[in-house]
Amino acid sequence: MDSNPDGKLILVVDDEFDVLSAYTMLFEFRGFRVRTAANGAEALAAAQRERPDIVVSDYMMPVMNGADLCVAWRADPALAAIPFILTSAGILPRDLLPPYDLFFRKPVSFDTLLAAIHQLIARPD
């Protein structure tokens, strides 16, 4: 599972430019196409322009955080079935139960994240 011959599209959402740059480079090296957004509102707009195969989003961001993005994502019939991975360097509030598929605490190893992505995009719709 080291490559992605189908060129699946990953939407990476994070307000830290270095994170976006690193993930873009690593995912593209593995054969994925990558789009990025700096907050949840930008991510929703990007997904309207080009529907991704999966989204990897940070939790703590300005404008619209990752939890609010996930709720809006699931409420949109065109996006609801797309797998959603939420990440955070902080601790999520105990009552935060948005309908994300997986959660990883940062820092998460790229190999762990990549394996989860392959698992989620390979599952039947």
Question: Where are each of the predicted segments found?
Answer:
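Two-component/phosphorelay signaling modules centered on CheY-like receiver
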Residues: 17-35
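A Lys-centered signature of the CheY-like receiver
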Residues: 106
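Receiver (REC) domain active-site loop signature in two-component systems and cognate sites
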Residues: 61
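Active-site residues of response regulator receiver
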Residues: 14, 58
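Hydrophobic/aromatic residues positioned on beta-strands within the core alpha/beta folds
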Residues: 87-88
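Non-catalytic signal-transmission and effector/linker regions of two-component phosphorelay proteins
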Residues: 1-9, 111-125
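Acidic catalytic/metal-coordinating carboxylates
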Residues: 38-42, 65-69
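Active-site beta3 strand of CheY-like receiver
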Residues: 50-56
